[in-house]
């Protein structure tokens, strides 16, 4: 009696098997959308970040605004550190400075924020740009409130202070505008 030989094994070609291909794609994370609506090519690009779509579609004027903000923060910081009397005089029109230390500390804080602004200018990461814009909007908003409260206490009013308040409100609006533009989901084509 001859032993029956088993039938030859058939290789399963996963490339031709639709269910297997779908399972493989799901495991690899290929072609799926994340919470931001971005399609990633692989799990590696999910881990490393995929900002290619954003670099193609930046809000108009964002980099110019980031540059102007960094220059503004740096300039005021250097002025507060080097010339505290002149900065105080420019804002509060001739009021006498009682101590230079708080103004210099303010300059140091602004210099730290300006370093963040300069670094955000060279990144394409949405999250970093949005946090920088939010920091900027909060800073200008707090500065507006502090100057307004100081005006209410002292009763000093001048053209310089009014220009400062109007400019701070404008800067808050611009920063919040870009904050929402950067965070906006791309339109489906």
Curated annotation (Swiss-Prot):
Its main location: membrane. It comes from the Eukaryota. Residues 85-108, 152-155 are extracellular. It is found in: Membrane. InterPro entries: TP53I11. Disulfide bonds: none annotated. Keywords: Membrane, Phosphoprotein, Transmembrane, Transmembrane helix. The keyword Transmembrane applies. It is a multi-pass membrane protein. Residues 1-63, 130, 177-189 are cytoplasmic. The modification Phosphoserine is found at residue 14. GO terms for cellular component: membrane. The chain crosses the membrane at residues 64-84, 109-129, 131-151, 156-176. PANTHER family: TUMOR PROTEIN P53-INDUCIBLE PROTEIN 11. This is Tumor protein p53-inducible protein 11.
């Amino acid at each position: 009696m001859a032993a029956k030989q088993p039938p030859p094994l058939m290789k399963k070609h996963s490339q031709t098997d639709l269910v297997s291909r779908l399972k493989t794609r799901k495991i690899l994370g290929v072609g799926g959308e994340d919470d931001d609506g971005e399609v990633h090519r692989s799990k590696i690009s999910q881990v490393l970040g995929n900002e290619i779509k954003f670099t193609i579609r930046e809000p108009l004027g964002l980099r110019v605004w980031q540059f102007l903000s960094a220059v503004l923060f740096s300039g005021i910081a250097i002025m507060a550190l080097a010339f505290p009397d002149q900065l105080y005089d420019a804002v509060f029109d001739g009021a006498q400075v009682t101590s230079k230390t708080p103004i210099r500390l303010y300059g140091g804080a602004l210099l730290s924020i300006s370093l963040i602004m300069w670094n955000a200018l060279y990144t394409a990461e949405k999250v970093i740009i949005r946090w920088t814009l939010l920091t900027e909007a909060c800073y200008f908003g707090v500065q507006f409130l502090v100057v307004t409260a100081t005006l209410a206490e002292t009763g000093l009013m001048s053209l310089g202070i009014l220009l400062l308040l109007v400019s701070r409100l404008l800067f808050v609006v611009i920063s919040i505008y870009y904050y929402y533009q950067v965070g906006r989901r791309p339109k489906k084509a």
